[in-house]
Design a protein with these regions (language model features):
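Extracytoplasmic/periplasmic proteins that interact with beta-lactams or build/remodel peptidoglycan
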Residues: 1-72, 91, 265-270, 386-392
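A short, polar/charged loop-to-alpha-helix boundary motif
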Residues: 89-102
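Active-site beta-strand/loop architecture of penicillin-binding DD-peptidases
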Residues: 214-256, 261-269, 293-384
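Active-site-adjacent helix/loop patches that line small-molecule binding or acyl-intermediate pockets
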Residues: 66-77, 113, 126-139, 147-204, ...
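Short beta->alpha transition motifs characteristic of CBS
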Residues: 83-89
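Extracytoplasmic/secreted envelope proteins and their assembly/folding machinery
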Residues: 54-58, 97, 154-161, 166-170, ...
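Active-site SXXK
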Residues: 57, 79, 100-132, 160, ...
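Conserved active-site-proximal loop/helix segments of enzymes involved in bacterial cell-wall
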Residues: 132-161, 197-199, 238-297, 301-302, ...
Length: 397
């Protein structure tokens, strides 16, 4: 076969696969198509999903039954999606559309992007101290003014990240960045960009802020216009875990001829550097503090100590009311990377629960359960290999 003919065949194959996958989304099918008709022949599609992991995720989603839930697990090293599950309580059914829909306000997850910009391009460090008034969960214009008050408090940037302080993020953005810079960093993280080749995943949206207050809103995630998909939420954590490199998410591993089994097409890994390594490492530390002492601490308090010592776990919470389907979103995006690098670069997990009238289970708790299952059943850590944390402890004694 000539080179041009081979190239045309690959393009045709990809186009047909994309068409079939999009049809699956259009009609809210429960599973991805495994076969596609290509001209006069049929091709097989293989996906990156881990069946055992997906079955476990479905089991825990049915146990807690939030009004809507989506759980994503991505392999940090390859960008392959190991699981992408959507669930709806009303019909007690799973679907494949919710994980890939970008109709969800990102809430405080966007603080990851803002932090990346501030750490890399300004004088802000995790130890920088900011003054604020009022509750950190609100964002009023008066809170952004530097007016002395007996009610004024001080908080480090590290603690502001761990406890998701909107006021400090708003003030830090106004003083240390611009709308253009934040827009560019959002683009680096994959906003306003096509993230996947096989699927017409709608773009996550970040709009340029026009005023200081809009900049504060966007930087803190305190708005309903910055939209994201659960897939993208997991990708954001993966960028941090990968020392600043974005591995574009993939779901198809190969397409082969149904008769000859010859591989017709397998997707190439696409990557881009988003952050310098030192910046990514600082962000890792901040996300780890969120899990240890911040807004996610309660969900990870009872993790098996041996497992915890073998992993570096970081995360970011977020909550906001709005989006489609409408409801109060409870977000958690996280990474779980083995301390022993022989076990690979680990996974990133995003959980989105949408609650209507009743709160059923925390997204951070579901993420913890997924991490525990993955490292016990799917990719067990070798108990005989002492971790770097244990080695450091031995040095101290």
């Amino acid at each position: 076969m000539k080179k041009e003919e081979r190239r045309e065949e690959i393009i045709t194959t990809r186009s047909l696969v994309k068409e079939n996958l999009n049809e699956a989304f259009k009609f809210s099918k429960k599973t991805f198509p495994k076969k596609v008709d290509l001209k006069e022949e049929q091709v097989d599609i293989k996906y990156s999903f881990n069946e055992d992991l997906t079955a476990y995720i479905k089991k825990i989603l049915k146990r807690y039954r939030s009004d809507y839930s989506s759980v994503i697990v991505i392999d940090n090293e390859t960008g392959y999606i190991l699981s992408a599950v959507g669930y709806e309580r009303k019909d007690n059914q799973f679907n494949i559309t919710l994980p890939f829909s970008s109709t969800h306000p990102s809430a405080s997850l966007f603080k990851i992007v803002t932090t990346a910009d501030l750490l890399e391009k300004s004088e802000v460090t995790k130890d920088s101290v900011f003054k604020f008034r009022g509750r950190g969960t609100t964002l009023y214009k008066y809170q952004l003014k530097d007016k002395k008050s007996r009610w004024q408090r001080r908080q480090s940037f590290e603690r502001a990240f761990a406890y998701s302080n909107n006021v400090i993020f708003g003030k830090a953005a106004i003083k240390n960045t611009t709308g253009e810079r934040l827009f560019d960093m959002a683009a680096d993280f994959g906003f306003n960009e096509k993230l996947m080749e096989e699927i017409s995943l709608s773009k996550s949206v970040f709009e340029m802020p026009d005023t200081d207050y809009e900049l504060a809103e966007k930087a803190s995630g305190f708005n309903k216009k910055t939209m994201i998909s659960p897939i993208h939420a997991a990708v954001m954590a993966s960028v941090v875990a990968n020392d600043g490199v974005l591995n574009y998410p993939r779901v198809v591993t190969e397409i082969s001829d149904n008769v000859t089994k010859k591989v017709i097409w397998s997707p190439q890994q696409r990557t881009k550097r988003v952050l310098e390594v030192p910046t990514a490492r600082e962000l890792q530390e901040l996300m780890e503090v969120t899990v240890k002492r911040g807004t996610a601490r309660g969900s990870f308090r009872r993790v098996n100590r041996k497992l915890l010592n073998g992993l570096e776990i970081g995360g970011k919470t977020g909550s906001i009311t709005g989006g489609i389907p409408f409801g109060k979103r409870d977000w958690f995006t996280s990474f779980a990377v083995p301390v022993n690098k022989n076990h690979g670069k680990g996974i990133s997990i995003a959980v989105m629960n949408i609650n209507l009238e009743k709160w059923y289970v925390k997204s951070s708790y579901l993420a913890r359960k997924v991490i525990e299952y993955y490292y016990k059943e799917v990719n067990p850590l070798n108990d005989n290999v002492s971790t770097a944390k244990e080695a450091e402890s031995d040095k101290d004694t």
